[in-house]
Amino acid sequence: MVRPLSLGELPPSYTPPARSSAPHILAGSLQAPLWLRAYFQGLLFSLGCRIQKHCGKVLFLGLVAFGALALGLRVAVIETDLEQLWVEVGSRVSQELHYTKEKLGEEAAYTSQMLIQTAHQEGGNVLTPEALDLHLQAALTASKVQVSLYGKSWDLNKICYKSGVPLIENGMIERMIEKLFPCVILTPLDCFWEGAKLQGGSAYLPGRPDIQWTNLDPQQLLEELGPFASLEGFRELLDKAQVGQAYVGRPCLDPDDPHCPPSAPNRHSRQAPNVAQELSGGCHGFSHKFMHWQEELLLGGTARDLQGQLLRAEALQSTFLLMSPRQLYEHFRGDYQTHDIGWSEEQASMVLQAWQRRFVQLAQEALPANASQQIHAFSSTTLDDILRAFSEVSTTRVVGGYLLMLAYACVTMLRWDCAQSQGAVGLAGVLLVALAVASGLGLCALLGITFNAATTQVLPFLALGIGVDDIFLLAHAFTKAPPDTPLPERMGECLRSTGTSVALTSVNNMVAFFMAALVPIPALRAFSLQAAIVVGCNFAAVMLVFPAILSLDLRRRHRQRLDVLCCFSSPCSAQVIQMLPQELGDRAVPVGIAHLTATVQAFTHCEASSQHVVTILPPQAHLLSPASDPLGSELYSPGGSTRDLLSQEEGTGPQAACRPLLCAHWTLAHFARYQFAPLLLQTRAKALVLLFFGALLGLSLYGATLVQDGLALTDVVPRGTKEHAFLSAQLRYFSLYEVALVTQGGFDYAHSQRALFDLHQRFSSLKAVLPPPATQAPRTWLHYYRSWLQGIQAAFDQDWASGRITCHSYRNGSEDGALAYKLLIQTGNAQEPLDFSQLTTRKLVDKEGLIPPELFYMGLTVWVSSDPLGLAASQANFYPPPPEWLHDKYDTTGENLRIPAAQPLEFAQFPFLLHGLQKTADFVEAIEGARAACTEAGQAGVHAYPSGSPFLFWEQYLGLRRCFLLAVCILLVCTFLVCALLLLSPWTAGLIVLVLAMMTVELFGIMGFLGIKLSAIPVVILVASIGIGVEFTVHVALGFLTSHGSRNLRAASALEQTFAPVTDGAVSTLLGLLMLAGSNFDFIIRYFFVVLTVLTLLGLLHGLLLLPVLLSILGPPPQVVQVYKESPQTLNSAAPQRGGLRWDRPPTLPQSFARVTTSMTVALHPPPLPGAYVHPASEEPT
């Protein structure tokens, strides 16, 4: 056994290095980058020293500033309007939407409430009288809903949408029609008499029972009222609408119902109807001509035989249409029912919302639990409620997440030595990050950036995880500062060593989120901007306020106070003799591979007069062979970490009696230095790492081909809820969307009729457009208008031929003949407006099916005023609206003959139904076809665009991938520039960007394997992943650049320095994300928790496995090298007086160094801080 050497036996020519020895630039290195680095680090050093000097003031002012910004949350606005959240900013869709609102206003024509009925058993048939009876029960319960608001009772008949209520000159008949006119309800029950039960209107006539649709025969009623009133015009209106006997002429589902009318086809036979046969082809409302509900709107999951006959269906759907808030407000404005409540549009909206919520509730409870069928109810208010609940801040999850992070930070930073522990720093750091997040969001509110679901559900946790990373980094670096650093410079030294890393990560994160704002979806643009601002506030808090907290904690540690409970002194504070390097004298240690360990044997005893433990450090030392060094002497260069106090435990027997416990020095840094780095940097391990990541990249490239576009509404709604069940059933059975083809102004409609017909034909031929029945004309205003003109032309021709209409009189003709007479004599010339010679020389519609241009706008005025049902069915929504014009056949004055022309149209629309849209590819195909049709029409001079929810929410997918690639490329370039500027090494910046690009590709591929579809939300996360990935890579890269020696040595040193803070940062991010897993929304779990968790794990693997291996193989040369001042004797060979260790300098390692390590066992504690009390050594024997 080799006898330990005394200090006097050290090699004679060793000169200890000065602490402030300046770094020397390597040969061939650029001096400008190093000067810039030195200048930047000098600024950080100065900042840290100033903050430490005025830590109390900085902390107070910082908390006040951040607290003031956090008050901005009081003015935060949460946006839940889908159009405001998802329509692309500045896109053609937003411009088209603006044009529509400019012409028609904010509100749609009506709102929809839907009931879907399916069998409990999968695939069960609903085309049975029993199933229809259950549907009637649910629909009837829903239609009888009443709510009381503002002292009034509101039922369906008051708030429902009524299509084309005609104006009748007879006051009594007009009031009766107003009360009786049916609501628009699209239901399969309209094929039967029971559909009348859903209509709640009633009227009273003397001598008759209450008139309701269940007992109303319009033909019989007109015959009874004929002798008492002139109803010829009203009769013609009903005949044109093909009302017939209305509901009383339809079969009864239950022919045994005592109220089933005698006119029902199966009333006398008492036979149940053939439900499949009756529903085949759809149903009609009270008007057979204008109210045809196509089969696809009523039945889902249908099956047919070989002849095309309907056999069965799996779902039924009924749709109740309500007025919009504006329509309801206008309808009751000035009415006697609302004159005393200050009627407003907001009140109208509240009435509709209350009725819709009650509608959904009662409909879902209508059927008994043991029924064979189930009802799914939904309304537009339900969707708003979902979005509102989706956007609410979950206080429980926020508080739980932050408490979990507080606990983790406190436990992670606790140490055995109370004076060295940093639990309070961890608590204060997390609370500071929470305040920074609140202040960032408050600043966003003050800047007018609206909040949305992503802001409230995701950002608090994501920002917490990212912000705490830098807290761990600074705290870790602060405890590992060189022990001989003067006390006033501790904070400056900490910022000088870690400020660059913090700046790099924060700037890259901000740039990443700002680049993510390139995605033109308002909700995600707001989220990206808010995230960037929050990261900026975190950066300011970490760089300015947190150093003040560390400085205060330094004072506590210097005074040997307890952690957390800083008012109490530490019971385990030690008094230690501080052994300075100068005590070694001017002796020099030759440079070689040998590991020089100066082991100071420490003995402790407790003084009788004090409770303090006194440590005596006798001057002894010995040399040991470094057999336990995993990487050889190369790992322990002066450029490496100086955190190996307590790492040497030489000696046996009584000298080892005070050896510390293993758990006292086993840390992540210890693991990285002694286990992880030696294993990772072996040649075979490097090959395995490169092979693994190459295979992962290859699999990810394949997975990227599996990623589909899309985001279904079912992904947003919580699973297991009734709303999710409805949306799933609707997507499966009734994937129908109402759209419109809008024609704008800027062209002459009268001379472009052929182009309009061609446009309609091209649009109708699209695969996704549901064609009308073969027996029904297209449902557009231009077709209805032309058909109406042809009808009155035929009536005129008949009256002219019979002599009831002559050149000078039309009083004996029919109502339609008289209208045609007035139109035919119009010239359109203001000087000579009438020309009676045209009665026989012109037609209202020519042989080509076109309306004469000079008659077009005057005929439009007459049609709008005379055919309200046709106008309502066409959904034309003319702007400017044609003027009102009343026709009186018996008024033959010249003024009555003149017809005012409508103003040139600036807005009109053709309605269509799209069906079969299940996947995003189906939507994209339909959108592209519609856009192509509009482009072709534009070449013919017709300005048109498609409108509807598919174009609002799915058109983003046309350019989403291009936008994604553009944002990623721009961000990678920006990341390269930022890293190259702050690291002053384009070589290193290139390696970082390579790793980040690999992470993005791999995350995209893993999304494909997980079945996560690509929408604007994953695009934001993918773009932001580049910035977040910098957290895991730049620390290792910076540690590699600032280390000395070979690539392996510098990679090991970088891992030792950064393994702990990077791991702590990843764990803190995962803890922040963990609270997202408790969300009620699968959307949050799948698209945020899963994706961000995968991103964090990928970042950890790439930062601690791939990047060190790449740096050890392809890393840039060191920028600086620390050179010790040595005497010439150091370079000569020498041998110790005792023992077999050689001090030869190996020729292959010209820059090898000896390392002097102070190891001592002081009640499990490292040496004290600079300036600690030093007790004089006693003469206690060894």
Swiss-Prot record:
The keyword Glycoprotein applies. It is found in: Membrane. The chain crosses the membrane at residues 58-78, 395-414, 429-449, 458-478, 502-522, 532-552, 687-707, 964-984, 992-1012, 1014-1034, 1065-1085, 1087-1107. Residues 394-552 form the SSD domain. GO terms for biological process: cell fate determination; epidermal cell fate specification; epidermis development; hair cycle; positive regulation of epidermal cell differentiation; regulation of cell growth; skin development. InterPro entries: HMGCR/SNAP/NPC1-like_SSD (IPR053958), SSD (IPR000731), TM_rcpt_patched (IPR004766). Expressed in epithelial cells of the developing hair, tooth and whisker. Residues 79-394, 450-457, 523-531, 708-963, 1013, 1086 are extracellular. Residues 1-57, 415-428, 479-501, 553-686, 985-991, 1035-1064, 1108-1182 are cytoplasmic. GO terms for molecular function: hedgehog family protein binding; hedgehog receptor activity; smoothened binding. The keyword Coiled coil does not apply. Belongs to the patched family. NCBIfam families: 2A060602. Plays a role in the control of cellular growth. May have a role in epidermal development. May act as a receptor for Sonic hedgehog (SHH). This is Protein patched homolog 2. It comes from Mus musculus (Mouse).
